[in-house]
């Protein structure tokens, strides 16, 4: 694969649709445009034309758009051919482009070229895929903020502050024998604290964005017939799981995605845990335990009329250590006066009293889930769509900055101090792609859809 040849791909989803788009990018597209569209469209103006195959037979009639370099998505010449969105028509139109000299684009190659041509930085490029994959409105808003450069601008601000500070520190090293004070101790302390505060704000916004992107996985566990499926249906707002009076009805894991304040919640209704000789039910319980291992939060449902039983205690004892846990006391509609719900973020535990039948206490459960994951609505409104690699880079930058702060007052440790600043800057620069290995770029863009 080269980065200067002509590439083409169907840019719209597979299947039938009113409109389908074939996108072409590269150099000297006039020849291809003449062969396929019969004309070279006027830049940035829609041209109605007939599309033809390699034997000059008419494939379709549609719109051709031409964007000259560098005023295009990729920074190269771009030709977009809009035809009727049937699979046969789109495949014929793509084949015509390939026979005219293009090759099939790799997944994410259009956006990769936009990155390589400085139309987008790496964080913005990733936000393109995140915007396409957004499962909630808030996640989509968060992704567009990153695409517009808000995340990148915040990173650039911290990188520039580190660059300015490094310049003064490096000057002190280069002219250590001269009686010149390039930066005072007070100024150094002020700048370090300012950068630290900047990083904390960026990390907080990025973490909120990560919740919007990844969501949270929640396993509903408990003994048979305590209301797990009823609670799933109540949270989902529809009947997605069968509810009966017969214990052991749920044999497999049922997954349902809901959103609470824009945060995707992946609910996993599991088979009830109990002693049984039923082979199929045993298989369901084995899947339940596997699901628990993958979950971020476990909702342990118990019957509020009897409280936590020895069987429930056995389930609690089998949970992985450190797992966030909410004990959901269900069927409060059968109690005269249920206790108040409590949430402890310090211990990552909560006791919530609900009625899956009437909906009482469901609001408290939803808020408890948000508190448990550390969701902050005020921060979420300005969140950046962040991936795990972004959080890892920010964490590394914070670690190196803390190490630099610890060395700031050691006159004989100036070189180590300067190195920690450099490493912090390097970690931040990897987010926007100012410093990124080729294998990282390949990993990122390979996850895009073809045609983007």
Swiss-Prot record:
Pfam assignment, any one: MnmE_helical
Cofactor note: Binds 1 potassium ion per subunit.
Residues reported in the UniProt entry to bind (6S)-5-formyl-5,6,7,8-tetrahydrofolate: 23, 80, 119, 452
EC number: 3.6.-.-
Residues annotated as binding K(+): 225, 244, 246, 249
Needed cofactors: K(+)
Coiled-coil regions listed in the entry: none
Chief place where the protein resides: cytoplasm
Cellular location(s): Cytoplasm
Binding site residues for Mg(2+): 229, 250
Superkingdom of the organism of origin: Bacteria
TrmE-type G domain mapped to chain residues: 215-374
Protein's job: Exhibits a very high intrinsic GTPase hydrolysis rate. Involved in the addition of a carboxymethylaminomethyl (cmnm) group at the wobble position (U34) of certain tRNAs, forming tRNA-cmnm(5)s(2)U34.
Subunit structure: Homodimer. Heterotetramer of two MnmE and two MnmG subunits.
Protein's name in the database: tRNA modification GTPase MnmE
Organism this protein belongs to: Nitrosospira multiformis (strain ATCC 25196 / NCIMB 11849 / C 71)
């Amino acid at each position: 694969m080269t980065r200067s040849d002509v590439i083409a791909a169907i840019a719209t989803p597979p299947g039938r649709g009113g409109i389908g788009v074939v996108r072409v990018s590269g150099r000297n597209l006039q020849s291809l445009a003449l062969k396929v569209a019969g004309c070279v469209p006027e830049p940035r103006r829609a041209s109605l034309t007939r599309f033809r195959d390699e034997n000059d037979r008419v494939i379709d009639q549609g719109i051709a758009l031409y964007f000259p370099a560098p005023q295009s998505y990729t920074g190269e010449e771009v030709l977009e051919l809009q035809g009727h969105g049937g699979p046969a028509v789109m495949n014929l139109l793509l084949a015509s482009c390939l026979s005219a000299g293009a090759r099939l684009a790799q997944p994410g190659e259009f956006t990769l070229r936009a990155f390589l041509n400085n139309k987008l930085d790496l964080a913005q490029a990733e936000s393109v895929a995140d915007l396409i994959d957004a499962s909630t409105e808030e996640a989509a808003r968060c992704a567009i903020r990153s695409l517009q450069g808000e995340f990148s601008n915040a990173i650039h601000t911290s990188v520039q502050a580190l660059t300015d500070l490094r310049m003064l520190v490096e000057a002190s090293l280069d002219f250590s024998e001269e009686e010149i004070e390039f930066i005072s101790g007070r100024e150094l302390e002020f700048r370090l604290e300012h950068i630290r505060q900047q990083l904390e704000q960026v990390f907080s916004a990025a973490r909120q964005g990560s919740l919007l992107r990844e969501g949270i996985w929640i396993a509903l566990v408990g003994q048979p017939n305590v209301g797990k499926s009823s609670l799933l249906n109540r949270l989902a707002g529809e009947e997605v799981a069968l509810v009966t009076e017969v214990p052991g009805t749920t044999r497999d894991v049922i997954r349902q995605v809901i959103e609470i304040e824009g945060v995707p919640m992946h609910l996993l209704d599991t088979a009830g845990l109990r002693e049984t000789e039923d082979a199929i039910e045993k298989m369901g319980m084995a899947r339940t335990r596997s699901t628990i291992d993958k979950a971020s939060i476990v909702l342990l449902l118990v019957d509020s009329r009897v409280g936590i039983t020895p069987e429930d205690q056995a389930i609690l004892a089998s949970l992985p250590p450190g797992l966030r846990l909410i004990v959901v006391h269900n069927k409060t509609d059968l109690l005269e006066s249920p206790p108040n719900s409590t949430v402890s973020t310090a211990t990552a535990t909560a006791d919530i009293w609900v009625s899956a039948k009437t909906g009482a206490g469901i609001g408290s459960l939803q808020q408890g889930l948000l508190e448990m994951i550390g969701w902050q609505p005020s921060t979420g409104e300005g969140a950046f769509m962040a991936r795990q690699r972004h959080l890892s880079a920010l964490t590394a930058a914070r670690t190196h900055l803390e190490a630099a702060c610890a060395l700031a007052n050691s006159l004989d440790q100036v070189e180590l101090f300067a190195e920690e600043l450099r490493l912090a800057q390097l970690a931040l620069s990897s987010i926007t792609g100012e410093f990124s290995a080729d294998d990282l770029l390949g990993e990122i863009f390979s996850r895009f859809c073809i045609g983007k």
